[in-house]
Amino acid sequence: LHTNSVIFAFVGNGIFAGVYYSLPRLLKTPMWSRVLSWTQFWSWQAIIVSAAITLPLGITASKEYAELEWPIDIAITISWVLFGINMFGTILKRREKHLYVAIWFYIATWVTVAMLHIVNSYEIPVTLWKSYSGYAGVQDALVQWWYGHNAVAFFLTTPYLGLMYYFVPKAANRPVYSYKLSIIHFWALIFIYIWAGPHHLLYSSLPEWAQTLGTVFSLMLIAPSWGGMLNGLLTLRGAWDRVREDVVLKFMVVALTCYGMATLEGPLLSIKVFNAMSHFTDWTIAHVHVGALGWNGFLTFGMIYYLVPKMFRTSIWSKKLANAHFWIGTLGIVFYTIPLYFAGFTQSLMWKQFTPDGYLVYKNFLDTVLQIQYAYWLRALGGTLYITGLFFMVYNVHRTVRQGNFLALEPAEAPAAEKSTGKESTGGYWHRWIERRPIQMLVFSLIAVAIGGLVEMIPTFLIQSNVPTISSVKPYTPLELQGRDIYVSEGCYNCHSQMIRPFRSETERYGEYSKAGEFVYDHPFQWGSKRTGPDLARVGGKYQDSWHFYHMLDPGKFVKGSIMPPYPHMFEKDIDLESTPRKIEVMRQLGVPYDESFIATANDSLLAQAGRIADNLAKGGIEVDKQKEIIAVIAYLQRLGTDIKVKPAAATTTTTTTGN
């Protein structure tokens, strides 16, 4: 819910507000359709409300940045298409010959987000609010992080770069520092960014060549990213004295600084030695919030403080309150991120520390959790400060609107034309040609962003050796499949990974490192990206059924110091037996080798296995109905990692072992 609120509600509405304000002024024409503008606005708010309702109810696809289920995915597609039609309708009827740099980023954003959303949302519905991903295991992970990384790139970055190229020059009353640099920045950024997704999967079961591509292109990203940051900051040349007094410029300078910090740190974290330390820790959480709070948040605030007085023909109601917002927001970012950086360093060091005799110092994962709880309290303080500043802005804007007079129609504006060099008569810069042709800009942008995805995904989907199989790995039983779906709906993937990396510290703690062939029936994959709790890839058979029963009932009481919430409803709610045949049927459509005849008898198999687990619990004095959800969850957890725990005589040649 938190992630989707930031992306769809906070950043999404910031994008649309900025585009709907800047686009008519850059093109010297009103938006093409007021009806489409309002329809798109209300449809987007409906999507936000639907996310706020469905996610807490456990209706989730479990794919990071793409958790929303298939009906909402369709609604997102429709709303995005409406936005695109309106944007291109406005561009095509423009009264300005050339497209300004901000519009290049708007166009690339629209076409790339459309491509990412359609490809990643390939799923087969099971019920109205449940679907299974069309991809499995390694393939699903690659597609997801091709999407996930580029959701950050083309929803949290490129549209905001477009807004930066409009609002920073307007607020500073200065032209963009370098037109040529903006060209290089744009094309290099959109081409390189799309390749970098695999850096989220380093040391995983993803093929090594794909991981290497992700690392190389991530490092290359530093150049265009910093080119854009410098182009923005150098636009303020001659106006730095105003930064002390102008709250709009203050917000924008900090936003650009945070953008530079995040886009340097991100590529550095794609270097394997750093990634080995940062992945699964709070270091990553700190990193993304420098971008979300500093770059997206502060640029949005600066934009609002600029455009609201313009729209209502007045000055901001209270400059002191706006400055208070700036400083309390900055403190909020500091208190939010710095403790999480320290928590991340602590987690990594504790996870990897061995005694002189070669044993893990902190064998119990909970030791790390207890050590960093201070960081979560400081994070809460930082978030409170940041939200308090936001309320300052809301009140300030409210009073500004009340004292002003809304300007319904404003004379359109555009940046001053560049001084003629005489080259225009003979064709000018090569880029001038494409700046006058929005459809060609759209097509070339699509080609630039599609290349990387095709190169990374086609081999993984077509070359079988990239996803090796293990003969002992079998599909989930109906009960385990139901348990897996409950695991997903409860959001367990947010705190637990299912990917053991090939480090001695991890194999000592969790067991043998994960193989690609283990996940061929996982629709969707559950590798995770954060360990608030221990990895579960090899948890099957590690504890008795009764341990899982009591642990799910009251984790804090059963494991002293645990911050895991209890799940009492699992002990009251029955398994949805009616959905079992449909789930097996959809899995068959996705290529999971269930016999067709098994669909009709799936619930018989489910109840038989559930009965065995209930009988086993009864031996320990635990009486529970075999149809309760907790039985399915126990079945799923006890299955994890057991397929490759076979006797030596039954082991296949594709299964390898690690030695210490």
PLM ranges: what are they?
Residues 1, 5-6, 141-142, 427-435, ...:
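Sequence context of c-type cytochrome heme-c attachment sites
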Residues 1-59, 71-91, 103-128, 145-171, ...:
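Hydrophobic cores of alpha-helical transmembrane segments in multi-pass integral membrane proteins
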Residues 388-400, 533-534, 543-550, 619-658:
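Extended amphipathic secondary-structure runs
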Residues 406, 410, 417, 422-476, ...:
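Post-cleavage N-terminal segment of exported redox proteins
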Residues 445-450, 508-629:
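Electron-transfer interface patches adjacent to heme c in soluble/periplasmic c-type cytochromes
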Residues 464-488, 502-503, 532, 619-629, ...:
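Electrostatic cytochrome c docking/interface patches
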